[in-house]
């Protein structure tokens, strides 16, 4: 068993490789260039590497472009040798009421602080790509065992639904926005049904239900129609003015998983999980899935940024991975917020832990050299095996 950590700058891409089957965890970046190389060159190197693996599945922790842009690139330049047996997604698709969450995810990419071009909506881009290249999908939520050896610790569908309803109902209190929110809800339900139709449970739908799914261009046209509604601009203005932080909803649904059985090579992958949710997981809030006492490898949440900092010292990790990189944000304040937290190194370094980082230029622990006693920086290489 080994973990291959790819250098994708401010993004995530890991491959859990063993002799029987491999699992790619996320595949994307926010950077247009990495180590001076165009990101498509990095993607091509990773794709070439993956093509040597016969049996492989993919897990997308959530729907930010820094986690899925490589997958979209791969699907656009389709090659049968790159097929995944299965793609795992967070479960925000199995029930009709989850369409409310999808509405918030769609809106998140259209707000000013989204960091994405207005035409690029990551959830819609993923559904669009899946319509063109249908895949076998499986939805993960707390307690679900997958690959016969891993178990999802998050998302908890009940918690997500509760947090969704709080925000969604608050928006709908504005009577001027009720009609456009209903339009978005109907559209989101169509997207939900598309994803659901690619799961084992969804494939059992009646032929009549399957026939309702249209070609990709039909949904693109409908989404453009909704965005052209005058009330839609009013909705975005309302969300921006009232600083409704929908971007965090993509973090709220992020998959967190560990080994299904306690052993010597315990893994903990945290995606971009929200700090409050990670605290709940660590405290075993429902008494069902405790974290283990010791981990061989922990993937630090959200590129090691200060806002998502978590103290893993009690778990005595042998290895910790921080997929960091320079993030060229719209402001100096935002760029600083996306640097690697100093609490992962220096005086706060966890003894006997080996740190693996993509890049040291964005780390607040790095001045005249790395402050971690045991560390490997992947840059300028393409990947590092752990």
Labelled PLM ranges:
Residues 10-12, 31-33, 63-69, 94-97, ...:
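Active-site environment of divalent metal-dependent phosphoester hydrolases
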Residues 77-266, 353-386:
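Flexible, acidic/histidine-containing loops and adjacent segments that form or flank the divalent-metal
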Residues 34, 243-244, 257-300, 306-311:
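Long, well-ordered mid-to-C-terminal structural blocks that present hydrophobic/aromatic surfaces
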Residues 42-43, 100-110, 123-130, 283-285, ...:
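Short, aromatic/basic amphipathic alpha-helical patches
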Residues 34-89, 287-307, 318:
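Active-site metal-binding motif and surrounding structural segment of the metallo-beta-lactamase
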Residues 1-53, 249-279:
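Conserved beta-strand hairpin/beta-sheet module of binuclear metal-dependent hydrolase folds
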């Amino acid at each position: 068993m080994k973990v291959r950590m790819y250098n994708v700058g401010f993004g995530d891409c890991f491959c859990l490789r063993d002799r029987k089957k491999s699992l790619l965890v996320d595949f994307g970046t926010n950077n247009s260039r990495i180590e001076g190389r165009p990101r498509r060159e990095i993607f091509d190197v990773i794709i070439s590497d993956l093509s040597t693996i016969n049996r492989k599945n993919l897990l997308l922790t959530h729907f930010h472009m820094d986690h899925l842009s490589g997958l979209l690139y791969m699907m656009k330049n389709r090659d049968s040798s790159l097929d995944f047996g299965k793609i795992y997604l967070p479960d925000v698709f199995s029930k009709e009421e989850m369409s409310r969450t999808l509405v918030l995810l769609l809106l998140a990419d259209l707000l000013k602080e989204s960091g994405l071009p207005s035409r690029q909506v990551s959830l819609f881009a993923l559904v669009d790509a899946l319509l063109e290249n249908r895949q076998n999908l499986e939805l993960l939520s707390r307690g679900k065992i997958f690959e016969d050896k891993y178990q999802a610790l998050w998302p908890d569908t009940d918690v997500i639904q509760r947090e969704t309803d709080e925000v969604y109902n608050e928006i709908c209190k504005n009577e001027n926005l009720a009609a456009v929110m209903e339009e978005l809800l109907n559209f989101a339900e169509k997207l939900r049904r598309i994803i659901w139709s690619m799961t084992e449970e969804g494939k059992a739908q009646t032929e009549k239900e399957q026939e309702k799914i249209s070609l990709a261009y039909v949904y693109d046209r409908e989404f453009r129609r909704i965005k052209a509604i005058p009330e839609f601009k009013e909705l975005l203005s309302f969300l921006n003015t009232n600083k409704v932080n929908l971007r965090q909803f993509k973090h709220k649904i992020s998959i967190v998983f560990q080994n299904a059985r306690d052993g010597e090579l315990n893994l903990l992958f945290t995606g971009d999980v929200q700090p409050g949710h990670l605290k709940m997981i660590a405290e075993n809030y429902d008494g069902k899935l405790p974290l283990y006492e010791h981990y061989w490898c922990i993937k630090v949440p959200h590129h090691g940024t200060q806002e998502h900092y978590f103290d893993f010292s009690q778990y005595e990790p042998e290895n910790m991975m921080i997929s960091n990189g320079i993030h060229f944000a719209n402001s100096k304040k935002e760029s600083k917020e996306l640097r690697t937290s100093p609490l992962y190194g220096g005086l706060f370094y966890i003894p006997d832990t080996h740190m693996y980082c993509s890049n040291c230029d964005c780390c607040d622990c790095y001045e005249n050299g790395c402050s971690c006693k045991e560390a490997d920086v992947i840059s300028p290489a393409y990947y590092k095996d752990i």
